[in-house]
Design a protein with these regions (language model features):
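Membrane-interface alpha helices of multi-pass inner-membrane proteins
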Residues: 41-57, 62-68
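Membrane-lumen/periplasm interface segments of multi-pass, membrane-embedded glycan/lipid transferases
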Residues: 81-93, 99-174, 229, 270, ...
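Short acidic/glycine- and proline-prone juxtamembrane loop motifs at membrane-interface regions
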Residues: 8-15
Length: 300
């Protein structure tokens, strides 16, 4: 998805790449401060954060969340040393953030017209509509192209979701308390953030949210999960054992099962029986017979 956005000259691509770079830099820096590397890390973090915050109007919020999430893994007793190494970078990024916010407010990029979607003034209706769209947002993070009219093959999404799910569940199993809090927090934000951010404009613009908007933050989920696993001795021992072979085998088997389920569902969705209303208590076989007899009568 990032490559597609970059090819279409979309600032979202730069924003996502900068978010990934900032996550990677801060996680390695905060978890293992090293006096010999702290200065270089602060420079990399400043460059990534500046590129992020200057990309789009939501970018300052992502900056705050990425820094806050990374602070959860800050090594105990390292706060002062990290601050000494990064205070100049923090000042520079703070100035860039203020400039970005001033530009956003000054040009009125967040201004919207009058109410055109009054049904979303109801919080209940809005929340239900957004929750029903969560699966669409997830697929859009992986890749839905064009004007949201070109999807990848189903097995592409199945493979991505299987791999990311495997990473996250494994990291939750072996991670420490603050590491688990980071992962659970990111999972929660994947649902809560769009709900909160879009609500003020939904009555005027409708449901305009796309999954890619959240990618600068959510690229941190597989990255953080992989970082947690790589830092655990138990996990490294498992990966070096004979059992490691069965992990991708099991993952591919699960993906294959999901693919078979998708094929069955897509075949059924084309069936005239599925499009017909099946009364309560009536079996599918009876519905098929009723549908067939109706078709015969219409052809006479």
């Amino acid at each position: 998805m990032v490559l597609f956005l970059a090819g279409s000259v979309n600032p979202n691509a730069l924003e996502i790449a900068a978010g990934f770079a900032l996550w990677a830099t801060l996680l390695s820096w905060f978890s293992r401060p090293d006096p010999e590397l702290d200065r270089a890390r602060s420079i990399r973090a400043a460059i990534a954060a500046t590129a992020l915050v200057m990309s789009r109007s939501l970018s300052p919020a992502f900056l705050v969340l990425i820094v806050g999430g990374s602070l959860l893994v800050l090594e105990r007793g390292a706060a002062r040393r990290v601050w000494r190494a990064g205070r100049i970078a923090a000042i520079v990024v703070g100035a860039m953030t203020i400039a970005a916010l001033a530009w956003t407010v000054g040009v009125g990029s967040l201004d919207t017209p009058g109410v055109s979607e009054p049904e979303y003034e109801s919080i209940k209706r809005y929340v239900v509509a957004m929750l029903l769209s969560v699966s669409d947002f997830e697929r859009q993070m992986i890749g839905v192209f064009g004007w949201l009219d070109t999807s990848a093959e189903p097995h592409v999404y199945n493979l991505w979701f299987t791999m990311i799910g495997f990473l996250v569940v494994s990291a939750l199993a072996v991670g420490a308390g603050r590491e688990r809090l980071l992962l659970v927090g990111l999972l929660a934000l994947s649902v809560v953030f769009p709900l909160v951010v879009q609500y003020p404009v939904a009555p005027r613009l409708g449901l305009i949210w796309q999954g890619r908007y959240l990618l600068p933050l959510m690229v941190g989920l597989p990255l953080a999960a992989g970082w947690v696993l790589a830092s655990k001795e138990r996990w490294n021992e498992l990966m070096s054992s004979r059992w490691a072979f069965w992990i991708p085998v099991g993952t591919l088997a699960a993906m294959r099962c999901q693919r078979a389920s998708d094929r069955r569902a897509s075949a059924e969705s084309a069936s005239p029986v599925d499009s017909a209303r099946i009364p309560p208590g009536e079996s599918r076989a009876n519905a098929s017979a009723t549908s067939a007899s109706g078709s015969t009568e219409c052809s006479r």
